[in-house]
Structure formats: structure tokens, C-alpha cells
């Protein structure tokens, strides 16, 4: 099969709506021959991530947490800090990653996600 490219324009949309659309396409649920245990031949491109619609309150109050498993290893970061440190597309990557099931195909599916600022 030929690889299909699914393009999403992020301008004016919220992170959750973009991420759910991208996750659905990465899992292959937009094609007629969907099979849950087979990796789909879909590449998802998200464009204009710098124009994503987020409220100022969300930028200051949305907190992403990571825990290393060690004592004192809990790290917290706001959406504003994440955007400043890694770029606007990283919030979309995190949201899509958390919407895709954590199984053996998770990393392969995430490699098919291309985020452009």
C-alpha cells in the first residue's frame, strides 16, 4: 500500500481537537480497512502550531508532570514554559501521545506524526 498523508491545519483550533483528530488518523480509524493490530500507513502532518488557540489562563495554569520514579523526581512545567522551552508543537506531541494506546505500536505510531511550527 502507498503511504497516505493526512494534513491538519492547527490555526485557530484548540490542542485537544487537533490531538484527537491526529490520534484517530494515526491509529488508522479514518480508513475503511481499519484493523486494530496492524500499523496503518498514514503520516499525519500538523501545520501552523504557533497559531493554536489557547487562552491565557490555560497557558499559565495547565501543568504537565513527569515522575522519574525516584524520591524528589516529580517535575512540573506549565504550558507557557513548555512552549518557550521546546516550541509550540511539543504540546501537540504530548497530547497525541497520551491519546494513543500504550502498547507495542505506540512508538511506531508516534514516528508517523510530523509537527511543523
Regions flagged by a language model, labelled:
Residues 1-94, 99-104, 109, 114-117:
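Ribosome large-subunit tunnel/peptidyl-transferase-proximal elements
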Amino acid at each position: 500500500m502507498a503511504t497516505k498523508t493526512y494534513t491538519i491545519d492547527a490555526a485557530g483550533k484548540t490542542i485537544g481537537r487537533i490531538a484527537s483528530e491526529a490520534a484517530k488518523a494515526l491509529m488508522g480509524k479514518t480508513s475503511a480497512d481499519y484493523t486494530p493490530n496492524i500499523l496503518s500507513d498514514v503520516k499525519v502532518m500538523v501545520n501552523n502550531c504557533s497559531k493554536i488557540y489557547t487562552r491565557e489562563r490555560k497557558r499559565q495554569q495547565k501543568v504537565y508532570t513527569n515522575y522519574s520514579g525516584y524520591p524528589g523526581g516529580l517535575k512540573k512545567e506549565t504550558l507557557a514554559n513548555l512552549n518557550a522551552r521546546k516550541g509550540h508543537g511539543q504540546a501537540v506531541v504530548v497530547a497525541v501521545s497520551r491519546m494513543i494506546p500504550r502498547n507495542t505500536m505506540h512508538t511506531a505510531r508516534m514516528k508517523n506524526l510530523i509537527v511543523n511550527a
